[in-house]
Amino acid sequence: MEQTLSIDGKKYNLLYKGKTASIYRDCFNRDLLVDIQEVQIKFGEAIEKNVREGNPDRDPYFVLLQANGSLFFERLVWVCIKTYDTYHGKETKAFQDFVDEIENYETYVMSGVVILEQVINANKATVQNESDEVTSDDKKKEV
């Protein structure tokens, strides 16, 4: 997944692929896929809690941020920028230096939320389950 993001009026190219996971691991000493799963689990639990408490219509982005905080989303945006830069021989500022210079922090973090959603949707199965497929021989038998 490759895209361009505008932060503080500056365009950044982002890239999410296998290399992203190794850069994330090297820079943050954490596993990206485990962190993504943890974010999803916390989000699901927060939705269930809101439903139990009579708040089923709360903004899902707010619920996601409230359940997980902003650090993961900061990291996700930065590591996707760093991945792109790595493939194109560019330098990326150190994570904390990069984040410290962001003027529009809310937009930066929300970009991470959108990227997470795209990553999750990009990894969903797009092929029909083989057990659900109907072969031409099966169709003939049904007639």
Briefly describe each language-model feature range.
Residues 18-38:
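Short, surface-exposed, low-complexity cationic segments
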